[in-house]
Amino acid sequence: PGIKGNYKEKDPVLPINKYAVSKFGGECSVQMYSNSLILRICMTEKPFIHKKAFNDVETNFMFHDTLAKNLLKLIDIKGIINVGGKKNTILNFAKKNNKDIDKISAKKIFGKNYPLKQSMRIDLYKKAIK
């Protein structure tokens, strides 16, 4: 995980910590019910609440209010959908609303094994909210 980026809904899931294992366990439980929808969401508060943001982590952050506007458009879908915004570094995403955010390196803080390419393919989500 976090090696290649642009992960699709069907790509293998390889949790790397207890939090990720708990999320994956929840997904597995929900998938036992065929009439379910699993949303893999990448969102954050608005405004971005931190004074620093990672310049080396690629992800698909979106603000929670954007998701709220589109959530009902997803309600009749079954399966798994990646939900997020345009692929970007966390720093570039955060700077769109606050130019004063400083950069910080996840690799320097967490080490070389930290997953830097966390982005997802969001094609199914974009199609669903049209």
Each language-model region and where it sits:
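Short glycine-/acidic-enriched loop or helix-start segments at secondary-structure transitions
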Residues: 1-4, 48-49, 92-94
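Mid/C-terminal beta-alpha module of Rossmann-like enzyme folds, strongest
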Residues: 70, 74-117
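Active-site Tyr-X1-5-Lys
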Residues: 14-42
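Alpha-helical elements of Rossmann-like donor-binding domains used by nucleotide-donor carbohydrate transfer enzymes
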Residues: 25-29, 54, 66-73, 82, ...
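Residue-level signal for the nucleotide or nucleotide-sugar donor/cofactor binding architecture
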Residues: 61-62, 88, 120
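Substrate-positioning beta->alpha
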Residues: 41-76
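Amphipathic terminal alpha-helices
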Residues: 120-130
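Active-site "gating" loop of Rossmann-like NAD(P)-dependent oxidoreductase/epimerase domains
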Residues: 1-16
